[in-house]
Amino acid sequence: MPQVKVTASAPCSSANLGSGFDTLAIALDAFHDRVTISDHDGFKLTGEGIPLDPERNTAGLAAIALLDELGLERDIEIRIEKGVPKGLGLGSSGASAAAAVKALDAYFGLGLTQEEMIGYAMIGEIASSGSPHPDNVSASIIGGLVLVTHDDDLRASRINISGDYRFLVAIPDLFTENKTRAARQMLPRSIPLDSYSKALGRTASLIAGLMSGNRNLIRVGMNDDIVEPSRISLFPYYYDMKRMALANEAVAAAVSGAGPSILMVCDEMSDMDSIRAGISEIFSRYNITGRVIEARMSGGAFVEGSPVSD
């Protein structure tokens, strides 16, 4: 028997982390989306500033995939409250899809596994990017740092991090319509074998560094010569910002998802005040307005009123 009403919340996320394209993402506590499921005669989406056509909305598309596959009636209202800013590389579409699936799981008492929830939520991403990529939704559902593999079967694993990291996110006031879809179209169709080998080594270095607390491995691992350069026109200030952050002892820096936001990993050695000032100066130099937020790693999606795990 469905519950009367269920609300779930899911955090924003930063995907790729340099070398981990479509495989690594981290949940951040800076912003959250909320989705409420309630009984309704027919299927209805509500919310401010979002597409209300379910086929064009990540939460709506994820919900349809879940309901239809499990043979459930579409007699629900889905109310979406956007807290994650759209189009800035912070997993906004993924947070909505993750919160919707989490709420539906609780509303119908389905007892879905994390992989099953991710599978439905990633279908929702088609509405935003044109492809069902699992990295952002995995982080928003599971929380923490998540590694995703998706060949014949989808597997998502939370990686335990050694160290106390804070994250500075440089968020420019730039908006590109259908940015994620456009950014994916900029990617190279093929890469040389030596580029693949170098990228694989960097991803391994990043994971090993985060698990061991080795900042040099993290710094090496968050470099990328494939995806970020192909999209540099979307964030021309990036390399200046990265050099500035590293000069002020940030552990590492990378484009957040498809941009245009930039993620900087900081620890006790980092001069965060100087990094903040440097971000403002670089935005000004490029005639861009923007802001800087500080975030911590977040837990995953949760049903409001239920216990929350870190």
Curated annotation (Swiss-Prot):
Record keyword Transit peptide present: no
GO cellular component: cytoplasm
Keywords recorded for this protein, A-Z: Amino-acid biosynthesis, ATP-binding, Cytoplasm, Kinase, Nucleotide-binding, Threonine biosynthesis, Transferase
Binding site for ATP: 85-95
UniProt xrefs under PROSITE patterns: GHMP_KINASES_ATP
EC number(s) reported in the record: 2.7.1.39
Biological or metabolic pathway of the protein: Amino-acid biosynthesis; L-threonine biosynthesis; L-threonine from L-aspartate: step 4/5
Location in the cell: Cytoplasm
A single BP term in Gene Ontology: threonine biosynthetic process
Leader sequence residues: none
Catalytic activity of the protein: L-homoserine + ATP = O-phospho-L-homoserine + ADP + H(+)
Pfam families attached to this UniProt entry: GHMP_kinases_C, GHMP_kinases_N
InterPro entries the record matches: GHMP_kinase_C_dom, GHMP_kinase_C_sf, GHMP_kinase_N_dom, GHMP_knse_ATP-bd_CS, Homoserine_kinase, Ribosomal_Su5_D2-typ_SF, Ribsml_uS5_D2-typ_fold_subgr
An example molecular function term from Gene Ontology annotations: homoserine kinase activity
Known role: Catalyzes the ATP-dependent phosphorylation of L-homoserine to L-homoserine phosphate.
Family indicated by similarity: Belongs to the GHMP kinase family. Homoserine kinase subfamily.
Name of the protein in its database record: Homoserine kinase
Highest classification ranks of the organism: Archaea, Methanobacteriati, Thermoplasmatota, Thermoplasmata, Thermoplasmatales
